[in-house]
């Protein structure tokens, strides 16, 4: 698979960076960056947290901080246009020596279109850089993705060269010592970051997601011609858009509101279903779906739900926030029509 999630128009939107943090100066492992070619119109900020009890304990919890809702209507036919990129939790290890955490408590990144995985850090706190890399000065900090990591005696800032094309990388085994991801040299022979005992580890990242509603109804609204889209693997699941577009069955409402779905890696989307909405070309009058009927999946609680950015048929966001961006072009949802997505 190529490194582009949106092969028809890979340079439509500016890059949205990945942000990885460890509280109280803890260290980060498995930090990733979104490749610049993987860009689309809608971005959803997703936050995960993981609690650790000690260097050899399994995580107490690993779940989303909140269960976001979605503007994705209830429909049986969905085509994936943009490849989701997800990351497992960052691994904050204890400041004691020895081997990394067991596989159950320390998992590498699940990343399919970029090559950044496990990093080796020196005895200092580490953080994700903003993409500004410099040459390694100590020579003891190397990454799996090449020369764009900056290292010195005070900090180790992993970053991935965004312009580089990476071959498809399968999901790594659930262990921190996967051979292909280990650095060639670690100072002191330890793969452990320095400060992390009893710390709360967090990994915050942006996730591009695009959906195109394709109806299963036979009544035509308008015929749309489109090109076959590349099948894109999401861990063990493969989502493919049919090579031809089916006729659409539409209702008549001035505003169409859809696009935006937070997805956890290798898990089903968590979203609210509304029994009053049609299952084909659903028209929404611009109202946010968040806080509606009871969620259809366990563990999804509407009180903690925050509506993501929704792009309406007029090309305007129906909700706002730091992770809410209007599309660069409104072709993906025109009022009353559905054109091919660029």
Curated annotation (Swiss-Prot):
Statement: the UniProt record of this protein carries the keyword Membrane: no
Record key words, sorted: Keratin, Repeat
Keyword Repeat in record: yes
InterPro entries: KAP
One GO CC annotation: keratin filament
5 X 5 AA repeats of C-C-X(3) as annotated region, ranges: 5-328
Pfam families found in the cross-reference section: Keratin_B2_2
Sequence repeats: 5-9, 91-95, 239-243, 309-313, 324-328
Family: Belongs to the KRTAP type 10 family.
UniProt protein name: Keratin-associated protein 29-1
